[in-house]
C-alpha cells in the first residue's frame, strides 16, 4: 500500500483524519504528457471513478472521467488523479490514484453545456498494444530482470522498479512476431516465480517475488469499532470448486536437460487429498522455469493456489486512497465471526467526496 505518512504528517495523524467523523476531501487532476511529465492541473473534470482488478489480464486499473476541457490531447495526454484529505491544521495529505491513458471520448451535449465522457487505462495498455515486429530472441545467460527492463524501456516505460534477481536464462528463448510485450514480460516473470507486472498509483512498473498471502503482513486493518469507517453491511460467499491433489510440471526444451517437479497432497486432514478422496486427480502442465529450484517453487505455488477454496467478502468503507494492487488486509467483524487476513481482489473508488469505496476480498481456505 502507499504510505500514510505523507506531506509531513505522521501515519497516526493521517489515520485519525481518515477515521474522523467528518472528513473534507477534494480531488485534483494532473495532466501529463506521453512521458508522464506534468503539463498542469485540469480544473474541468466534474467527476469519475477508478476501479482496480488484480486478476485482470489487460489493464489492472481503469478509470472514467467527465471532462469539459477542450485543451486535452486525447491521443497522447494522460491523467493522474490525486485525492487530498484536509488535515486539522488546514493542510492536506495527498495520494496519487494512478496514471491513465485516455481513450477517444464521447461528447455529451446538454442545455448546461458540453462535456466528454472518457474511459482510461493504466500503462499495461502500452505493453499490450506494443508488439514485436519480428521474432524476439533473448539469449541464454541474460539476466531475467535485465531482459524485462530492456523490453520496458523499448516501449517507452522508463519508470520501473522490478526487484533484482541473479537468475539467468538457462537457454535462449524466443517469441513469434506479433507477441505483445506484456506477454513476453509476464512469461519471464513467471519463470522466476515473480508476480505479474503491475503499475503503482504513481505510475511505476512493479513486480516482486511471489509470496503467499499467509506470508505477507496486512497493509491495513478494517475493524468494526467505534471509529470504524467500515459499513455495517457486507456479504460473504464460500466459492467451492473441485481441485486436483497431485501436480506435475515439466520443462522440456531442445537445448537443455528436461526438468520435472511433482507435488502431491497426502495430508490426512485435507478433504481433497489423495488419502481422503481415495483417488488421484492429476494436474499436468508444461511450464517455463529458469532451473529446478524455480520449477519446484512454481509447482508448490500452483498446488497451493489450486488446493483451496475462496471465501469472498464484499464490503464498503469510506474513501481510502492508499490501496494499490493485490493488497493484503486484515478484517475484524465480530458480528459475522470474521477475524482474518484477506487478499484484495478488486476495489472501486468514486471520485466524489463522501462516497463509499467498495472492496472485494478473498480469503484462502486450504483444502
Which positions does each model-derived feature cover?
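Acidic, small/polar-enriched beta strand-loop surface segments
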Residues: 1-36, 186, 190, 207, ...
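Short beta-strand-centered interaction patches in the first periplasmic/extracellular domains
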Residues: 2, 93, 110-127, 163-243
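Extracellular/virion structural assembly segments
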Residues: 23, 33-80, 126-130, 139-142, ...
Amino acid at each position: 500500500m502507499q504510505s500514510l505518512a505523507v506531506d509531513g504528517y505522521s501515519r497516526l495523524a493521517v489515520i485519525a483524519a481518515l477515521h474522523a467523523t467528518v472528513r473534507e476531501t477534494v480531488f485534483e487532476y494532473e495532466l501529463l504528457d506521453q512521458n508522464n511529465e506534468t503539463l498542469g492541473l485540469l480544473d474541468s473534470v466534474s467527476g469519475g471513478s477508478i476501479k482496480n482488478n488484480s486478476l485482470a489480464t489487460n489493464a489492472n486499473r481503469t478509470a472514467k472521467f467527465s471532462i469539459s476541457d477542450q485543451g486535452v490531447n486525447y491521443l497522447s495526454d494522460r491523467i493522474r488523479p490525486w485525492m487530498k484529505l484536509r488535515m486539522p491544521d488546514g493542510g492536506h495529505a495527498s495520494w496519487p490514484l494512478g496514471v491513465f491513458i485516455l481513450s477517444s471520448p464521447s461528447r455529451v451535449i446538454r442545455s448546461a453545456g458540453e462535456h466528454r465522457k472518457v474511459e482510461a487505462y493504466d500503462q499495461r495498455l502500452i505493453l499490450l498494444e506494443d508488439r514485436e515486429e519480428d521474432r524476439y530472441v533473448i539469449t541464454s545467460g541474460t539476466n531475467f530482470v535485465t531482459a524485462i527492463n530492456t523490453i520496458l524501456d523499448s516501449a517507452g516505460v522508463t519508470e520501473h522498479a522490478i526487484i533484482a534477481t541473479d537468475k539467468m536464462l538457462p537457454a535462449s528463448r524466443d517469441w513469434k512476431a506479433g507477441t505483445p510485450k506484456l506477454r513476453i514480460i509476464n512469461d519471464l516473470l513467471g519463470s522466476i516465480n515473480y508476480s505479474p507486472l503491475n503499475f503503482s498509483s504513481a505510475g511505476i512498473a512493479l513486480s516482486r517475488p511471489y509470496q503467499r498471502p499467509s506470508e505477507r503482513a496486512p497493509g491495513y486493518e478494517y475493524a468494526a469499532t467505534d471509529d470504524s469507517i467500515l459499513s455495517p453491511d457486507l456479504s460473504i460467499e464460500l466459492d467451492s470448486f473441485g481441485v486436483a491433489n497431485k501436480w506435475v510440471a515439466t520443462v522440456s526444451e531442445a537445448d537443455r536437460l528436461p526438468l520435472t517437479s511433482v507435488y502431491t497432497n497426502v495430508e490426512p486432514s485435507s478433504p481433497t487429498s489423495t488419502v481422503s478422496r481415495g483417488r488421484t486427480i492429476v494436474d499436468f502442465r508444461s511450464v517455463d522455469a529458469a532451473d529446478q529450484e524455480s520449477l519446484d517453487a512454481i509447482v508448490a505455488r500452483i498446488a497451493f493456489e489450486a488446493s483451496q477454496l475462496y471465501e469472498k467478502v464484499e464490503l464498503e468503507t469510506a474513501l481510502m486512497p492508499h490501496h494499490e494492487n493485490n493488497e493484503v488486509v486484515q478484517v475484524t467483524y465480530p458480528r459475522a465471526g470474521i477475524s482474518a487476513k484477506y487478499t484484495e481482489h478488486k476495489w472501486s473508488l468514486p471520485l466524489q467526496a463522501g462516497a463509499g469505496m467498495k472492496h472485494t476480498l478473498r480469503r484462502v481456505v486450504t483444502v
